[in-house]
Amino acid sequence: MSDKPLPSSFDDDPDFFQDNAWKKLGRRLKEEPLVPLGIGATCYALFRAYRSMKMGDSVQVNRMFRARIYAQAFTLLAVCAGSVYYKTERDQRKQLEKAMDLKKQQAKRDAWLKELEIREQEDKDWQSRHATIEQAAKGVEVKPFVADSAPDAAGRDASEEPAKESGDKKDGGSGGVLSAVKNLSWGSK
């Protein structure tokens, strides 16, 4: 196994570290400062109408309800004017967000593919080690049969030598898998 941790497709989401709600609200307030002003005027008119209603002043109540309607109209105009004025900037922001999303998806996909490749390579390494150990175990079992029959032993030894040489090349010329297993089990150098 490698020392470094494998990348995972379940890593932390970087969207969390970008604009949070307060930053977005601050940006919107800077972009369209008249909208919150209209909302505040509407709320103030409703509050004054409520107080006038509690006091029983119907003239002031009607005046405040009219003020509320004017404040709401002002708010709607501010929203419409702001949307027309900032339309190109919002389109650019949407395109930038789409590009960033595509980049994030591509990075996540690349990390996922790299993770799969690493795991596949580890599986192949494990299978090759397992096959090598299995071949070494079979080689130990076959050897007593070779020693029993003298005429066949010479033919088998000649046919096994190329196989041993090819096995030596795979293992880096260390004397073969069989000798490595013998060294491990009998403690010789």
Swiss-Prot record:
It holds the Pfam family HIG_1_N. Its main location: mitochondrion. InterPro entries: Hypoxia_induced_domain (IPR007667), RCF1 (IPR050355). Belongs to the RCF1 family. It is found in: Mitochondrion membrane. GO terms for biological process: mitochondrial respirasome assembly. Residues 86-122 form a coiled coil. Residues 154-172 have a biased composition (Basic and acidic residues). It comes from Trichophyton verrucosum (strain HKI 0517). Cytochrome c oxidase subunit which plays a role in assembly of respiratory supercomplexes. Associates with the respiratory chain complex III/complex IV supercomplex. Keywords: Coiled coil, Membrane, Mitochondrion, Transmembrane, Transmembrane helix. This is Respiratory supercomplex factor 1, mitochondrial. The chain crosses the membrane at residues 33-49, 64-86. It is a multi-pass membrane protein. One of its GO terms (cellular component) is mitochondrial membrane. Residues 142-189 are annotated as: Disordered. Residues 6-97 form the HIG1 domain. The gene is RCF1.
